[in-house]
Amino acid sequence: MTRIESTFETLKAQNKKALIPYVMAGDPNPSNFVGLLHDLVKHGADMIEVGLPFSDPMADGPTVALAGERALAAGTSTRDALKMVKEFRQQDTQTPIILMGYLNPVEIIGYDNFVSLCEQSGVDGILMVDLPPAEAGSFTQHLTEHAMNEIFLLSPTTLAERRQQVLTHCGGYIYYVSLKGVTGSATLDTDDVAKQVQAIKAETDLPVCVGFGIRDATSAKAIGAHADGIIVGSALVQNFADIDANDITAVANAQQKIMAKMDELRGALDSL
């Protein structure tokens, strides 16, 4: 059983929902990032999605795309992100870490080498936005051999054939994209999301977690009532926008705002 699977099993036994924050590796600066991960756990994160900075993030909305730009400007590479996860693992051996990114940086490192580095760093799951499940065969095999889960996206516009491929090949949890568009989009139709989540759960035993458009306690509670977990990114990383990454006070204040949002989201989920 992987760390992700074990965490969901524990949450189910406790009748709790997973809170999964998304943050960009190296944002706002590399020296603060590991501390940020630990603070997220202290404020209720059950697992964490870590974005891999990439120069052409086609599925990212402006908030997350800018986070990637800040991380790249600070010199954060995919290898650096893995080093940060490894440092996090020195103190936290329980909280699952999922890497979310794009294939190009992984292909540069090489699938075999990348998966080995992930295992050595303590990564638990991988979500490659631009890797279709039908083309993921060898990559999926490498991950399975190293006890890591490969996670795929489902969305309102996923075609039936692709949907079945995702349900067949996905591990850990299903990431359901609640909106048509990019990360950080607005207008969340909770009734439609509830129907979609119920339909997915009728086809798989995997937990279903919902991301895109969850910003506050109200949306967290509305979605958490139907999903096994929520994924929140833009509402957190937007706090690092327009600050001086070298200003210790500004970074600390931004992180305080992020943790206040985490407390709000955790409280909403725990009230269900």
From Swiss-Prot:
Disulfide bonds: none annotated. HAMAP family: Trp_synth_alpha. GO terms for cellular component: cytosol. This is Tryptophan synthase alpha chain. Its EC number is 4.2.1.20. Pathway: Amino-acid biosynthesis; L-tryptophan biosynthesis; L-tryptophan from chorismate: step 5/5. GO terms for molecular function: tryptophan synthase activity. It catalyses: (1S,2R)-1-C-(indol-3-yl)glycerol 3-phosphate + L-serine = D-glyceraldehyde 3-phosphate + L-tryptophan + H2O. PROSITE patterns: TRP_SYNTHASE_ALPHA. Tetramer of two alpha and two beta chains. The active site is at residues 49, 60. It comes from Psychrobacter cryohalolentis (strain ATCC BAA-1226 / DSM 17306 / VKM B-2378 / K5). Belongs to the TrpA family. The alpha subunit is responsible for the aldol cleavage of indoleglycerol phosphate to indole and glyceraldehyde 3-phosphate. It comes from the Bacteria. PANTHER family: TRYPTOPHAN SYNTHASE ALPHA CHAIN, CHLOROPLASTIC, TRYPTOPHAN SYNTHASE, ALPHA CHAIN. Keywords: Amino-acid biosynthesis, Aromatic amino acid biosynthesis, Lyase, Tryptophan biosynthesis.
